[in-house]
Every structure is written in structure tokens, then in C-alpha cells.
């Protein structure tokens, strides 16, 4: 009876990750986890779900907040570092064309299930991510758009009024909610995103024109002299 020759099992040597690669791997896996399950639980539970030990996780991120901040930097700030401020401020091009191109690129960056779920989860959890991001949108995007609208309307450069900011937020928020309806609620939407942006711009620019006209009327109004 012939004896079978034992099969030699070759151990696959795993590539040892560098510190930077390991850190990036943690951030990527944490991003996926936060998008699916939110931000609940402590570092021990987080390490278990990431498939690593808690001490190893601590070597790269001393606290859960540190990991969340890195996820925020990668997911939220990374896509925004694309020179959009220069695009919005380029007065050699028509304002409407700049806004159309900006919101096309902006929504291309944020309209993903992962991005939107993390944003909504962080809002429910009361994390700083939302406050940071809302502040960034106000200071870097909406204030700049209002400044360009004021220039287009021939108004003096000044701090945005409450009415101007609110109009800009309604416009911006409407475009944002299009993404929520499509990628979070799986609700039917107009599939032509460029057309949606163009329609929203019609409403916003008409509204800003009315605000500009009201401001001009107030400047022209005669001053009543008492007595």
C-alpha cells in the first residue's frame, strides 16, 4: 500500500506595514465602521471591531477623539482642498458659471453614502465634526459666494447680512438635501444633477437680486429731518 506523500504547506509571509500605512489602514477601517454603525462605544469596543488590540490602537491614536478628528480630516477636509476658493473668486468668468461649476464639483465630492452617513451620525451624536464643518461652509463657501454676489450687484463689500446668509444657507441646504434624499433615503430624485443645480441657482440669484434691490432702495430713501 503506497503511503501518501505529506503535502508541504507554505506559510505566506505577510508584508509588514509601515507606521504610516498602519495608521492609514486604521483611519480607512474606522471610516467604514463609523459610516455603518455611528460613533457609539469606547476604544476597547472600537479596537475589537477593527480587529486589533486596544494597546496597538493607542499607539497611533491616544483617544477615540483623535481617531475621529483624523477621519474628519480625511473625509471632510481632504476633498475640499481643491482650489475652489480661486474658482469662486475668478471674476474673469461670469458668476453663474462659477457657481454652477463649483456646486458640480462640490457635490461630486460629498455625495457618497459614506460621507453623508458619517455627517448625519456625527450630528446626532453632537460631535464637533458638524460644528467644524458648518463653520467652514459658512466662512469658506457661503461668505465668499455672498461677496461675489454683492460685487456683481454693485454693492459695497461688507460683512454678509443675516438675510443674505440665510438665503445662502437655504440654497446650499437644498442642494445638500438632494444628496440625502438620493443616497440615504433612496428616494426618487431628478437624475440630472446639473439641471437641479441650475434650477437652484435660478431661485438663489433671483432672491439675492431682490435683497440687493431692497438695500439700494434703503440707500436712496430720503432722510427725514426732525422739526
Question: Which residue stretches match the model-derived regions?
Answer:
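N-terminal intrinsically disordered/low-complexity leader segments
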Residues: 1-21, 87, 212-227
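Hydrophobic/aromatic residues within well-ordered alpha-helical segments
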Residues: 22, 64, 71, 75-76, ...
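Helix-turn-helix
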Residues: 25, 29, 33-70
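Amphipathic alpha-helical linker/stalk segments
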Residues: 71-101
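Short secondary-structure transition hinges
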Residues: 85, 90-91, 97, 108-144, ...
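Short alpha-helical scaffolding segments that buttress acidic/His motifs in well-ordered protein cores
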Residues: 103-106, 119-123, 171, 175, ...
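Amphipathic alpha-helical packing segments from all-alpha helical-bundle domains
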Residues: 108, 128-154, 166-169, 198, ...
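Hydrophobic alpha-helical segments that form the core
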Residues: 158-184, 192-206, 227
Amino acid at each position: 500500500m503506497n503511503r501518501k506523500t505529506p503535502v508541504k504547506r507554505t506559510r505566506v509571509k505577510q508584508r509588514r506595514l509601515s507606521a504610516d500605512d498602519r495608521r492609514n489602514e486604521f483611519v480607512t477601517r474606522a471610516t467604514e465602521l463609523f459610516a455603518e454603525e455611528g460613533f457609539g462605544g469606547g476604544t476597547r469596543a472600537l479596537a475589537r471591531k477593527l480587529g486589533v488590540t486596544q494597546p496597538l490602537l493607542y499607539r497611533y491614536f491616544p483617544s477615540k477623539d483623535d481617531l475621529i478628528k483624523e477621519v474628519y480630516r480625511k473625509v471632510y477636509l481632504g476633498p475640499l482642498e481643491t482650489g475652489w476658493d480661486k474658482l469662486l473668486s475668478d471674476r474673469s468668468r461670469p458668476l453663474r458659471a462659477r457657481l454652477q461649476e463649483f456646486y458640480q464639483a462640490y457635490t461630486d465630492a460629498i455625495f457618497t453614502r459614506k460621507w453623508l452617513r458619517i455627517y448625519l451620525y456625527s450630528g446626532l451624536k453632537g460631535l464637533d465634526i458638524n460644528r467644524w464643518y458648518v463653520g467652514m461652509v459658512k466662512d469658506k463657501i457661503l461668505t465668499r459666494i455672498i461677496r461675489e454676489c454683492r460685487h456683481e450687484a454693485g454693492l459695497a463689500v461688507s460683512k454678509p447680512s443675516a438675510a443674505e446668509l440665510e438665503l445662502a444657507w437655504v440654497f446650499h441646504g437644498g442642494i445638500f438635501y438632494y444628496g440625502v434624499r438620493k443616497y440615504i433615503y433612496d428616494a426618487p430624485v431628478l437624475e440630472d444633477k446639473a439641471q437641479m443645480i441650475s434650477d437652484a441657482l435660478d431661485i438663489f440669484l433671483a432672491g439675492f437680486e431682490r435683497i440687493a434691490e431692497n438695500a439700494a432702495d434703503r440707500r436712496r430713501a430720503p432722510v427725514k429731518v426732525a422739526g
